[in-house]
Swiss-Prot record:
<keyword id="KW-0863">Zinc-finger</keyword>
<dbReference type="GO" id="GO:0005737">
    <property type="term" value="C:cytoplasm"/>
</dbReference>
<dbReference type="GO" id="GO:0005794">
    <property type="term" value="C:Golgi apparatus"/>
</dbReference>
<dbReference type="InterPro" id="IPR001841">
    <property type="entry name" value="Znf_RING"/>
</dbReference>
<dbReference type="InterPro" id="IPR013083">
    <property type="entry name" value="Znf_RING/FYVE/PHD"/>
</dbReference>
<keyword id="KW-0812">Transmembrane</keyword>
<dbReference type="GO" id="GO:0010917">
    <property type="term" value="P:negative regulation of mitochondrial membrane potential"/>
</dbReference>
<keyword id="KW-0256">Endoplasmic reticulum</keyword>
<dbReference type="GO" id="GO:0008270">
    <property type="term" value="F:zinc ion binding"/>
</dbReference>
<dbReference type="GO" id="GO:0005783">
    <property type="term" value="C:endoplasmic reticulum"/>
</dbReference>
<dbReference type="GO" id="GO:0016020">
    <property type="term" value="C:membrane"/>
</dbReference>
<keyword id="KW-0472">Membrane</keyword>
<dbReference type="GO" id="GO:0043161">
    <property type="term" value="P:proteasome-mediated ubiquitin-dependent protein catabolic process"/>
</dbReference>
<keyword id="KW-0479">Metal-binding</keyword>
<dbReference type="InterPro" id="IPR051834">
    <property type="entry name" value="RING_finger_E3_ligase"/>
</dbReference>
<dbReference type="Pfam" id="PF13639">
    <property type="entry name" value="zf-RING_2"/>
</dbReference>
<keyword id="KW-0862">Zinc</keyword>
Length: 155
């Protein structure tokens, strides 16, 4: 690309240069684009790639958490508005014998018994049943190895 030719072409198009000689804009091909155009295209591509990567990571973590709760029947809640629905205010964790307080992280089992999340994890390391009613947490086909995987994911 010849910058003087390009500038003369612009000036001719604006009527700033005498028109006694033939003055026209040279055709611009993809190879003649300035370097900053390449940087804009490359930067936009990187930006879109990073947004896609962030979205995929967020979506995968949501799916992993959803699959974990469906697979093991263990639901994790924070004691806020859900506590009124589960009627947990003033109740005691059967593992540590402490009352539930605001913003406590709770684990709710399929039998609707709630415990502190840390207490439940410690309990599941020893026994794979509900501390209140002794119902099994995992289905009959689940092995103790899958419960170990559950404990690894919770911690």
């Amino acid at each position: 690309m010849h910058p003087f030719q390009w500038c003369n072409g612009c000036f001719c198009g604006l009527g700033l240069v005498s028109t006694n000689k033939s003055c026209s804009m040279p055709p611009i091909s993809f190879q003649d684009l300035p370097l900053n155009i390449y940087m804009v295209i490359f930067g936009t591509g990187i930006f879109v790639f990073m947004l896609s990567l962030i979205f995929c990571c967020y979506f995968i973590s949501k799916l992993r958490n959803q699959a974990q709760s469906e697979r093991y029947g263990y639901k994790e809640v924070v004691l806020k508005g859900d506590a009124k629905k589960l009627q947990l205010y003033g109740q005691t964790c059967a593992v540590c014998l402490e009352d539930f307080k605001g913003k406590d992280e709770l684990g709710v089992l399929p039998c609707q018994h709630a415990f502190h999340r840390k207490c439940l994890v410690k309990w599941l390391e020893v026994r794979c049943v509900c501390p209140m009613c002794n119902k099994p947490i995992a289905g009959p086909t689940e092995t103790s190895q899958s419960i170990g995987i559950l404990l690894d994911e919770l911690v």
